Design a protein with these regions (language model features):
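N-terminal secretory/targeting leader peptides
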Residues: 2-17, 22-120, 128-333
């Protein structure tokens, strides 16, 4: 079904499913869906709740998806594995968390100096991005829809100012995706930590710095209490797209109406998430500054070194992984 027809289905589904004969013919289905994010991140975890509620609404409550925050069923970085293995039918996560399986997962969330939110939307909806993503996901017995974007992100929280490349050397930095490999080339010591575990790691000195999303989430996480230097921009995430992943067998067993309901709910989530961040981030940033955050911009020498290192990194990885090379080439057309 094309997107125009799909959105038409969204408009008519509640009316159609109100017809008793149709409603009675639909089966009762119960799924479980795991999130990579704890409840404290209300937009991130809340997006999964909104998807669940919308699916229920569009199916006359015949199809119910019970949602679980990170840690209740599986850890935040194990969502893909749980969906693939059928431990849960679905999950809401960022594909770049699974870089250890295949670097080709990374461009479907964010690339350093890559696509912003609008460009990601253009690529996924009109440039073959969805098809490329699901080619990869099929290798893991998963079907997925894009389901939210954070918008441009901040550059993270640091215990000390970073004014030169020398000050990056040995810096224990929580960072995701290929940006970790980039900062490693710049001398830092990157590590990937699940969102729920970032604050205690920063508080105990296990890490010296962290990036996450932006003001709204950073205020809720209270990172300003343990690291006051707040950097911009998050040049490794001009936009960051999330996915609603489904076990392939569980998805195949659904009636078409339920598949359409999921697609509609995810399409709405794509637009809703970034608008919520755009509405909340300005006030959250003011509150962070009032709480003691010291805003800083990356020094030009670091930005220039990062650009050079990123070009070299992408070239190296493209030579090693033909699938990554293809995905990268087809995505960058949209910049």
């Amino acid at each position: 079904m094309n997107r125009r027809a799909l959105m038409g289905a969204a408009a008519t589904a509640p009316v159609a499913l109100a017809t008793p004969a149709i409603a009675q013919s639909l089966p009762e289905v119960r799924w479980r869906a795991a999130s990579s994010f704890p409840r404290v991140f209300d937009i991130l975890y809340g997006t999964l709740e909104k998807i669940s509620a919308r699916v229920a609404q569009l199916t006359d409550n015949k199809f119910r998806i019970q949602t679980f925050p990170a840690g209740e069923i599986v850890g935040g970085l194990q969502v893909l594995d749980a969906v693939q293995g059928g431990n849960v039918e679905a999950g809401h996560t960022a594909s770049y968390y699974y870089i250890g399986k295949d670097i080709s997962f990374v461009p479907f969330t964010a690339m350093t100096f890559g696509l912003n939110t609008r460009q990601l939307t253009a690529w996924f909806r009109h440039g073959g991005g969805n098809e490329l993503a699901n080619e990869l996901f099929r290798d893991y017995s998963i079907v997925a829809h894009t389901a939210g974007d954070t918008g441009a992100q901040m550059g993270g929280w640091f215990r000390n100012e970073v004014q030169s490349l020398d000050q990056l050397r040995g810096l224990k930095f929580r960072i995701t995706g290929l940006a970790g490999q980039l900062f490693q080339r710049l001398g830092a010591a990157p590590t990937l930590i699940a969102p729920a575990d970032i604050y205690p790691a920063l508080e105990r000195g296990v890490i010296d710095a962290t990036e996450f999303v932006g003001p709204h989430d950073d205020l809720r996480a209270n990172y300003v209490r343990v690291a006051r230097y707040y950097y911009a921009p998050g040049f490794w995430e001009p936009g960051a797209r999330l996915h609603f992943m489904m076990n392939q067998r569980a998805h195949a067993a659904l009636p078409d109406q339920y598949k359409y309901a999921i697609e509609v709910a995810c399409s709405e989530a794509d637009a809703e998430m970034v608008s919520r961040y755009d509405a909340s981030n300005p006030q959250a940033l003011r509150r962070l500054v009032a709480a003691g955050a010291q805003l800083r911009f990356w020094p030009r020498p670091i930005m220039e070194a990062a650009w050079k290192a990123n070009e070299e990194l992408n070239a190296d990885l493209a030579r090693q992984n033909p699938r990554f090379a293809k995905i990268l080439e087809l995505s960058l057309i949209h910049i």
